[in-house]
Regions:
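Conserved active-site-adjacent core of cysteine acyl-enzyme catalytic domains
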Residues: 38, 204, 209-343
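Active-site-adjacent structural segments surrounding the nucleophilic cysteine of cysteine proteases
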Residues: 126-128, 134-220, 395, 407
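Low-complexity basic/metal-binding stretches
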Residues: 331-332, 337-347, 353-398, 403-409, ...
Length: 445
C-alpha cells in the first residue's frame, strides 16, 4: 500500500518483488530458507528501489517475530545527490534482545541516523529509498519472521490536504503518566499511547509491558518510535510510522483506527519545544462557536480520568508535527506473548492473593506479597468494562480533578463533556462481569 510519502510493504505478492537471499516466503512472511528440515543460519531480503518525493527525514518500521536465539536487522539507504548512499543499520532487534538505537553517519556524509530518524544532509534532499532486512538464527529449528516493512518520508515541499470534515469519535482507554511507573520518566508517554491503541482492540497489556518491550538500552528511554511499532507487531498488530496530514488522520479515524500523533509545546525557560505523543480518537464540530475540534488522549494529564481532552482544530494543526503511528486491528491468530516478563527471563513474580472476608458488594482486595525493588509502583490498568458498545460514557459527566497550582497544561482544554450517545462505531464489547467468589490476577506466561 502506497500513500504518497508513506510506503507499507506486506504480503506474499509484495515481498516477492524483492531479492531473496537464503530467505523464503511463508504465510506472507519472510523467513529463513531451510535445508533438510533445518533453517539456514543467515539470510537477507532487499526491497526494490522506490522513488519518493524529495524529502529531508525518513522513518523506517518493521513488524517481526523473533523467537529465542533469532534476530532481525533492518537497514536502509537513500538516493541523494544523484547517487546511492551506503547502507545504514537501525541495529539488531529481537523482543528479548537488549535493543540499542544507533547514532551514526554514512561514509559519504550524505545522511545520518539519530535513533529512529534518518536525516538527509544534501541540499536537494533524498528522492529514493531502498530497505534491507537481515535474518539470523543460532537455532536451526527456529527462524525469525518479518511480516511488514514500511518507510515514511517528510517531503521538503509538503502539499498538505485537509480532506472532508468528519464528525466521529472512537473509544480509547485513558492512561496518564502520574498513575504509572515513574522510573521510565516523561518519555513513557509513547508506551501509554501504544498500550491504549492495542487495548482498544481487545488486547490485555499494561503500559509497563510495552515500555519494557520497546526500551532503548542506549538511552535508557522509551521514545524510539521504531521500537514502539516493532513491539506492537510482536502482539500481532500491523503497526508502522507515518508522516500524515489532516486528510490522512481523518482517513484513519473514518476507518475506526485511532492514531498516535506527536505534538509540540513550549515550556517556560526552555528554548526548544518539547514533543509529546498523544492519542487521536476523533473529530467533531462545535455549533456554538462554529469551529472544528479534535479529540485527544493526553498522557500528561493529572489523572486517568482527565486524559480525554478537546483541542481546536486550528491549534492542533499548529502543534502537530506530522509524525504519527498507525495501528490496525490484528487479523492473525493469537500468538504466544513474547513481551510479558517471567521467571524464565529473570523477572521476579508478583504474587497476588485475596485478603479479608468475602464482600461481593465491596469488591475484592488484593495484596502484593513481593515487589521488584526498582519498580514499586503497581501498574494501573483500566479496561473498558463499563463503556457501552457505542463508545459513549454512561450518562454522567467526568469528575474534573483539582488543577495543580502553577502547572502548565500540555494543550488548552477548551471543554470536557461526556461523549454523545450517537458516538461512532468501533469500541470493543463490554467484558463479562466476574462471578462472586472469584479472584482475577495476572500471571506470567
Amino acid at each position: 500500500m502506497e500513500q504518497r510519502n508513506n510506503l507499507v510493504l506486506q504480503g506474499t505478492e509484495t515481498f516477492s518483488r524483492g531479492a531473496l537471499d537464503n530467505v523464503a516466503l511463508e504465510s506472507g512472511a519472510l523467513v529463513l530458507d531451510s535445508s533438510a528440515g533445518r533453517y539456514l543460519p543467515y539470510g537477507s531480503y532487499t526491497t526494490p528501489e522506490f522513488a519518493m518525493p524529495a524529502f529531508c527525514n525518513l522513518n523506517v518500521s518493521w513488524n517481526a517475530s523473533a523467537p529465542h536465539n533469532t534476530m532481525v536487522e533492518v537497514r536502509c539507504r537513500v538516493y541523494a545527490g544523484n547517487t546511492w548512499t551506503g547502507w545504514m543499520s537501525f541495529g539488531k532487534w529481537a523482543p528479548d534482545y537488549p535493543r540499542c538505537s544507533i547514532n551514526a553517519q554514512s561514509e559519504d556524509g550524505m545522511i545520518f541516523l539519530l535513533g529512529d530518524t534518518v536525516t538527509v544532509a544534501t541540499p536537494g534532499g533524498g528522492t529514493g529509498i531502498q530497505l534491507q532486512v537481515n535474518l539470523s538464527t543460532n537455532d536451526d529449528k527456529s527462524t525469525p519472521a518479518v511480516r511488514l516493512l514500511s518507510a515514511a518520508v517528510r517531503p521538503l515541499t509538503w502539499e498538505k490536504h485537509e480532506g472532508r470534515p468528519l464528525n466521529r469519535r472512537l473509544y480509547l482507554p485513558e492512561y496518564c503518566l502520574s498513575a504509572h511507573d515513574p522510573s521510565f520518566g516523561r518519555e513513557m508517554d509513547l508506551p501509554l499511547v501504544m498500550a491504549a491503541l492495542m487495548n482498544r482492540w481487545g488486547e490485555d497489556i499494561l503500559p509497563e509491558e510495552v515500555a519494557y518491550a520497546m526500551e532503548d538500552n542506549a538511552t535508557r528511554s522509551t521514545g524510539n518510535a521504531a521500537f514502539a511499532a516493532a513491539a506492537a507487531g510482536c502482539c500481532g498488530f500491523p503497526c508502522w510510522q507515518a508522516w500524515m496530514d489532516l486528510q490522512d488522520l481523518r482517513t484513519q479515524i473514518h476507518d475506526d483506527c485511532p492514531v498516535a500523533v506527536r505534538v509540540e509545546r513550549r515550556i517556560r525557560g526552555q528554548r526548544d519545544p518539547v514533543g509529546i505523543w498523544m492519542g487521536l480518537r476523533g473529530f467533531g464540530h462545535d455549533d456554538a462557536v462554529m469551529a472544528d475540534y479534535v479529540l485527544l488522549n493526553d498522557p500528561t494529564a493529572d489523572s486517568d480520568g482527565s486524559v480525554n481532552c478537546t483541542m481546536a482544530l486550528s491549534d492542533f494543526l499548529r502543534y502537530f508535527t506530522g509524525r504519527a503511528i498507525a495501528l490496525r486491528c490484528s487479523r492473525r491468530p493469537a500468538q504466544p506473548r513474547p513481551l510479558r516478563p517471567g521467571p524464565q527471563r529473570g523477572w521476579p513474580l508478583l504474587l497476588l492473593r485475596a485478603a479479608g472476608p468475602a464482600r461481593p458488594a465491596a469488591g475484592r482486595f488484593l495484596r502484593l506479597d513481593r515487589l521488584h525493588p526498582a519498580r514499586r509502583h503497581r501498574p494501573c490498568h483500566h479496561g473498558p468494562p463499563d463503556v457501552p458498545p457505542d463508545g459513549a460514557h454512561p450518562g454522567r459527566g467526568p469528575v474534573l480533578p483539582a488543577r495543580t497550582a502553577g502547572r502548565r497544561r500540555a494543550v488548552q482544554r477548551l471543554r470536557r463533556r461526556p461523549d454523545r450517545p450517537d458516538a461512532g462505531r468501533g469500541s470493543p464489547p463490554a467484558r463479562a462481569a466476574q462471578t462472586p467468589g472469584s479472584t482475577a490476577c495476572r500471571t506470567s506466561e
